[in-house]
UniProtKB/Swiss-Prot annotation:
Serine/threonine protein kinase involved in conjugation and sporulation. It is thought that it phosphorylates the byr1 protein kinase which itself phosphorylate the spk1 kinase. SMART domains: Ras_bdg_2, S_TKc, SAM. GO terms for molecular function: ATP binding; MAP kinase kinase kinase activity; protein kinase activity; protein serine kinase activity. This is Protein kinase byr2. Signal peptide: none annotated. It is an enzyme of class 2 (transferase). It holds the Pfam family Pkinase.
Length: 659
């Protein structure tokens, strides 16, 4: 009763023979939460002046409070199965009935939760009553049963909940406007109480929901922006998609302005607003902001890349759009450009970060004239003018992860509606250490240079980048789902069949990288993304390195390789700092297999220093005891102490474990 809407109150009045008072109750927006506070004097104000009718109302109300009408709830458990259960609001009794329908026992070992877009919310008994007796609550159809010891739904249960949520209309919060007289009498807590709870706890592992769910709940994922702006973006994306289908290609252009909430723009420090051609001068001369980099490159590291005009057909399906199909089509006429990561400055022999004119990333960012808080035609006009602007405006959404050097946010191209993962690195956070700052910029420049070259179905696609006075943004393909490490944390170890599938895809990505002379150097579960259809994407190239083909630097007498990577996944030659080759990734791949099979990193009983010592002493990680002979042979080959004896990624693709 307490959670009845005004419409349900009207239906109840009709059922007890008081339908003549429905209009007066509706005019005063009387809902279930108000019924307990109604007395005979207040009922007279609502038109029930007859004392006998008033007493009849109070008697029926008390009966309704003691014996509420049953509702139908749908529970999800056991790998996406659903069961309908009738409930009168008793949490424990309802849970016991639901568990019995799923052939589960001991209600004390289970609890109930719901998914709300990208979040999971555990349900208390009071919140359970709210859901039961609020007929407009969308959570009634997707209550998830989870173990109390590990209160996290399985992937199948979560997928089923998302499917149901996608089919539901967005829940509307009920806004009451009571008459002044009733407002002065009823308790404030009763007037303002909200039916839906907003205390949803985000996923600890930064879940990446599918684009369809983001589209249907877009305000949840871009909470700082006004819904009208987001709706306009989706509308524009549909219109632009229709026009682009008739053209031969689409120019991604330069990423520039971030559309900021009005409050953020007011407090925003001054930013670099300059054409790309002047950026070399601006950055090179500002030696106080960008410290010199001790490591030099002679000649400067130069990488061929292409303007982000088009994308290979094999990657068209990987682009995630909000409400539209992929925009990028190959026209076969890509123009090449040079991306100079380092150049000589006028300040001695030291190198500073700079970018040549015409390179694909545009390190420009400025506040947008669009006001997310405005409801005037300004919102409508500004987005339509984007076609004349060479830089692309984008909208920052929710936090979805962390990388080697910064946090990763959900982003959206304000013109096309394309979803992106935006790796954002705050430059000011390392200003206290010039040496660390220099290394950061060095690594980021290297990451961008590598990413520009890559185009493969199992590699996260680079889209662009920009720079302003306080942070660097790297725009990457949005991969719905999550990392292998996050899935292991939530669901436990993988079956060997699934491991084979994931490792085979990872090997294809490594084969592509190694064929281009690139060593990832940080293969681990946290850097392997899995989309919601099971496709693997290798990510986070923050410490990757491009090898010089036929170089002697990895042999005796060459430059000493750096100590880079995650300790538990390091190969012996990395720990000993003797060489870095593509075989380093093969050792880490073996560690990834163990991680997937056990849901723990290699050397689980060691801390980082102990693990490094054991690796340096050529002590192999312990193999899981219940794996197949082909898995054992695969691991033995990847863990060859002599890196020259380890097979290549191409050779491992023909191994029985994955073939």
């Amino acid at each position: 009763m307490e959670y009845y809407t005004s419409k349900e109150v009207a239906e109840w009045l009709k059922s007890i023979g008081l339908e003549k008072y429905i209009e007066q109750f509706s005019q005063n927006n009387i809902e279930g939460r108000h019924l307990n506070h109604l007395t005979l004097p207040l009922l007279k104000d609502l038109g029930i002046e007859n004392t006998a009718k008033g007493k009849q109302f109070l008697k029926q109300r008390d009966y309704l409070r003691e014996f509420p009408r049953p509702c139908i709830l749908r529970f999800i458990a056991c790998n996406g199965q659903t069961r309908a259960v009738q409930s009168r609001g008793d949490y424990q009794k309802t849970l016991a009935i639901a568990l019995k329908k799923f052939s589960l026992e001991d209600a004390s070992k289970f609890i109930v939760c719901v998914s709300q877009s990208s979040r999971i919310k555990l349900i208390t008994e009071e919140e359970f009553k709210q859901i039961c007796f609020n007929s407009s609550s969308p959570e009634r159809d997707r209550l998830i049963i989870v173990p109390k010891e590990k209160p996290c739904p399985s992937f199948e249960d979560l997928r089923r909940s998302w499917e149901i949520e996608l089919a539901q209309p967005a829940a509307l919060s009920s806004q009451s406007s009571l008459s002044p007289k009733l407002s002065s009498v009823l308790p404030t807590s009763t007037q303002k109480r909200s039916v839906r709870s907003n205390n949803a706890k985000p996923f600890e592992s930064y879940q990446r929901p599918p684009s369809e769910l983001i589209n249907s709940r877009i305000s949840d994922f871009f909470p700082d922006h006004q819904p009208k702006l987001l709706e306009k973006t989706i509308s524009n994306s549909l219109r632009r998609n229709l026009s682009i289908r008739t053209s031969q290609g689409h120019n991604l252009g330069n990423f520039g302005q971030e559309i900021l909430p009005r409050s953020s723009r007011r407090a925003r420090p001054s930013e670099l607003v300059c054409p790309l051609s002047s950026l070399r001068i601006s950055v090179a001369e500002d030696v106080n902001r960008l410290p010199r980099i001790d490591r030099g490159f002679d000649p400067p590291l130069t990488v061929s890349s292409t303007q982000r005009i088009s994308r290979p057909p094999s990657l068209q399906k990987s682009i995630t759009m909000v409400g539209v199909e992929p925009l990028y089509q190959s026209n076969g006429n890509e123009k090449s450009s040079k991306y100079n990561v380092f150049s000589e400055s006028a300040h001695g022999n030291h190198q500073v970060l700079s970018f040549s004119p015409g390179s694909s990333p545009s390190f420009i960012e400025q506040p947008s004239p669009i006001s997310p808080t405005s409801t005037t035609s300004e919102d409508t006009n500004t987005l339509e003018e984007d076609t004349d602007d060479q830089s692309i405006k984008w909208i920052r959404g929710a936090l979805i992860g962390s990388g080697s050097f910064g946090q990763v946010y959900l982003g959206m191209n304000a013109s096309s509606g394309e979803l992106m993962a935006v790796k954002q690195v705050i430059l000011d956070s390392v200003s206290e250490s010039k040496d660390r700052h220099a290394k950061l910029l060095d690594a980021l420049a290297g990451e961008i240079a590598l990413l520009q070259e890559l185009s493969h179905e199992h590699i996260v696609q680079y889209l662009g980048s920009n720079l302003n006075s306080d942070h660097l943004n790297i725009f990457l393909e949005y991969v719905p789902g999550g990392s292998v490490a996050g899935l292991l944390t939530m669901y436990g170890s993988f079956e060997e069949t699934l491991v084979k599938n994931f490792i085979k895809q990872t090997l294809k990505g490594l084969e592509y990288l190694h064929s281009r002379g690139i060593v990832h150097r940080d293969i681990k579960g946290a850097n392997i993304l899995v989309d919601n259809k099971g496709k693997i994407k290798i990510s986070d190239f923050g410490i990757s390195k491009k090898l010089e083909l036929n170089s002697t630097s990895t042999k005796t007498g060459g430059a000493r390789p750096s100590f880079q990577g995650s300790s538990f996944w390091m190969a012996p030659e990395v720990v000993k700092q003797t060489m870095h080759t593509e075989k380093t990734d093969i050792w880490s791949l073996g560690c990834l297999v163990i991680e997937m099979l056990t849901s723990k990193h290699p050397y689980p009983n060691c801390d980082q220093m102990q693990a490094i010592f054991r690796i340096g002493e050529n002590i192999l990680p312990e193999f899981p005891s219940n794996i197949s002979s082909s898995a054992i042979d695969f691991l033995e080959k990847t863990f060859a102490i002599d890196c020259n004896l380890r097979p290549t990624a191409s050779e491992l693709l023909s191994h029985p474990f994955v073939s």
